[in-house]
């Protein structure tokens, strides 16, 4: 049997304007083919959304389509996004922190209207040819606590603009696993069977068997203490089909189908860390912003900027007490005149989900914990 773990920090009642925001991150996730995956759909979508605000022409049209937004909905969607972020509250047992930084080279002329509207969200001026990596890492670490978010492979002397967002989540299970009951047990995947530390808890949880095109999957919700955040776990024989079926609306629908049951739940402890170049994924959704001849960010500057790099670093640790997960998404731009450089038991899926807004902060797949 193949298992899917969805660690989802999402809001179950997404407004129609933000469903496309969530779906953009899900589509990006579906284009990742690794065995073990941890990814932040929220981090990806947030970077794309913040690049939409200064975009114009075909670049704006493509990004609006990516977010499934009409032009007149952009302002209200931004307001709803900021409102949704306010609902990701930190409590005694759960800590959620999100940051956004836009670093623009001193040589780029920013329009006063753009600066006035967005500087309060974290707009910085610097010289990318003078120790930019250390300066940016210092600012990001001061704001987020995350260190060494960027390196010299991400930024170079051609860089003129970098958009960086971070997300950090730490949650304690509402129903913790008893550490004294963790035992070595078998986990079977396509490569064979291995021994892993398997956690165990007997408690009442919300779960159900859901059916997708005659395929059945067992889904269970593991809530975090004192927060509207849950981990959803799903397991079945065809997890590729399950992943292909995921949308923001379907996650809402499936979550409403879950009922209270007493489970003897066994889940392996696991840690995953991924560092990936996601430019090719974003390029499929909004190709013009990566094209030196077609990109346009004229709502921010008349300089001929285009995106030439995009990365996401993410990691997650799941144990008997709860979950710690973090991700940073980095989008890097240069000017057209610069030479372009190209930087080339069973498996399960996880989604970390805020149960009020629909934002998917993390999702992934574990083939070998």
Swiss-Prot record:
Signal peptide: 1-15
Family: Belongs to the serpin family. Orthopoxvirus OPG040 subfamily.
Membrane topology field: Peripheral membrane protein
Signal recorded as keyword: yes
Cell location: Virion membrane; Host cell membrane
Protein name: Superinfection exclusion protein
InterPro entries linked: Serpin_dom, Serpin_fam, Serpin_sf, Serpin_sf_1, Serpin_sf_2
Induction info: Expressed in the intermediate phase of the viral replicative cycle.
Recorded GO MF terms: serine-type endopeptidase inhibitor activity
Pfam families to which the protein is assigned, alphabetical: Serpin (PF00079)
GO cellular component, one term: extracellular space
Subunit structure as annotated in this protein's UniProt entry: Interacts with OPG185/A56 protein.
Functional note: Negatively regulates superinfection and syncytium formation in infected host cells. Acts in concert with OPG185/A56 protein at the host cell membrane by interacting with and inhibiting the mature virion entry/fusion complex (EFC). This mechanism ensures that new virions released from the cell cannot enter already infected cells.
Entry keyword set: Host cell membrane, Host membrane, Membrane, Protease inhibitor, Serine protease inhibitor, Signal, Virion
Primary location class: virion
Organism: Vaccinia virus (strain Western Reserve) (VACV)
């Amino acid at each position: 049997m193949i298992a899917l773990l969805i660690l989802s920090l999402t809001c179950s009642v997404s407004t129609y304007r933000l469903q496309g925001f969530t779906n953009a991150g899900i589509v990006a996730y579906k284009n990742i083919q690794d065995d073990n995956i941890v990814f932040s759909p929220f981090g990806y979508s947030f970077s794309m959304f913040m690049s939409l605000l200064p975009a114009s022409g075909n670049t704006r049209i493509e990004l609006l389509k990516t977010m499934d937004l009409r032009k007149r909905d952009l302002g209200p969607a931004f307001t709803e996004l900021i409102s949704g972020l306010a609902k990701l509250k930190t409590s005694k047992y759960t800590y959620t922190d999100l940051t956004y930084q836009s670093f623009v080279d001193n040589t780029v002329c920013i329009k006063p209207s753009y600066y006035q509207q967005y500087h309060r969200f974290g707009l910085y001026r610097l010289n990318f040819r003078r120790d930019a990596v250390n300066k940016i890492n210092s600012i990001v670490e001061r704001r987020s606590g995350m260190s060494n978010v960027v390196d010299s492979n991400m930024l170079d002397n051609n860089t003129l603009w970098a958009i960086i967002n971070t997300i950090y989540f730490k949650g304690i299970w509402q129903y913790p696993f008893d550490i004294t009951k963790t035992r070595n047990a078998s986990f079977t995947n396509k490569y064979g069977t291995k021994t892993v530390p398997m956690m165990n808890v007997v408690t009442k949880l919300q779960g159900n068997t859901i059916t997708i095109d005659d395929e059945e999957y067992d889904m269970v919700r593991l809530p975090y203490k004192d927060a509207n955040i849950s981990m959803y776990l799903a397991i079945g024989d065809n997890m590729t089909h399950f992943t292909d079926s995921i949308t923001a609306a379907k996650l809402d629908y499936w979550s409403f189908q879950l009922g209270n049951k007493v489970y003897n739940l066994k889940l392996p402890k696991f840690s995953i860390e991924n560092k990936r170049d996601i430019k090719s994924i974003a390029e499929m959704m909004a190709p013009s912003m990566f094209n030196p001849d077609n990109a346009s960010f004229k709502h921010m500057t008349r300089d001929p900027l285009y995106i030439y790099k995009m990365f996401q670093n993410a990691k997650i640790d799941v144990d008997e007490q709860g979950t710690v997960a973090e991700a940073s998404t980095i989008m890097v731009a240069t000017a057209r005149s610069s030479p372009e450089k190209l930087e080339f038991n069973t498996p399960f899926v996880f989604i970390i989900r805020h149960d009020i807004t629909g934002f998917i902060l993390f999702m992934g797949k574990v083939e070998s914990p």
